[in-house]
């Protein structure tokens, strides 16, 4: 589900980037340029802490959160 969301957001951003090339901006207006990664994080709302994997023993909800890719669901902890 999360990967589908990331792919969907990536496609959405690609369409926006392509359409922005054809749009004209008002003269003299300086807009901050964002990398695709920054724009994606702003849309999804991810912070630096959420992007880093969790170590063994740390709290988790799904396996993708753990560095080991294993989350013991009933204890809600990353395991080896």
From Swiss-Prot:
It is found in: Secreted. Disulfide bonds join 53-67, 60-71, 66-78. Coiled coil: none annotated. Its main location: secreted. Residues 1-24 form the signal peptide. Keywords: Disulfide bond, Ion channel impairing toxin, Knottin, Neurotoxin, Secreted, Signal, Toxin. Belongs to the asilidin-1 family. Residues 25-46 form a propeptide. The presence of a 'disulfide through disulfide knot' structurally defines this protein as a knottin. GO terms for cellular component: extracellular region. The keyword Disulfide bond applies. Expressed by the venom gland. It comes from Dolopus genitalis (Giant Australian assassin fly). This is U-Asilidin(1)-Dg12. The lineage of its organism: Eukaryota, Metazoa, Ecdysozoa, Arthropoda, Hexapoda. Negative results: the recombinant peptide has no effect on Kv1.3/KCNA3, Kv10.1/KCNH1/EAG1, Kv11.1/KCNH2/ERG1, KCa1.1/KCNMA1, and on the drosophila Shaker IR channel. Neurotoxin that may modulate ions channels (other than those tested). In vivo, induces neurotoxic effects when injected into insects (tested on L.cuprina and A.domesticus). GO terms for molecular function: ion channel regulator activity; toxin activity. The keyword Disulfide bond applies.
